[in-house]
Amino acid sequence: MRTYLYCEAGFVEKAQWLPNSWVNVVCPNNDDFEFLTKTLNVPESFLDDIADTDERPRTDTEGNWLLTILRIPVQNKQNENLPFGTVPIGIITNNEIIVSVCYYNTDSVSYTHLTL
């Protein structure tokens, strides 16, 4: 699922990508992958790294792109003794765009629709 957010008076969802906006991608499918790599020219290696469930927090660069990988909490419904686990989220930036990619559906980015 792909969402385009533009900063006006808070984050406003747009129907299509605009320069200087934020593209939030959750559980990317083939269309999302193609959009990111072909339309936005995001390095494919960045998306592969984010897909690795064991990926550790770090930064990397390729060309004018910066990748920051963080780990965010997700509810663990399979083990009640360990209520939360963490999964990687990638924040990919260049001079015109911010892209966040997470291969898991989490609530961590769902608060972006709030007005600041």
Predicted regions and their residues:
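Conserved small/polar residues in nucleotide/adenosyl-binding loops
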Residues: 112-116
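Divalent-cation
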Residues: 1-110
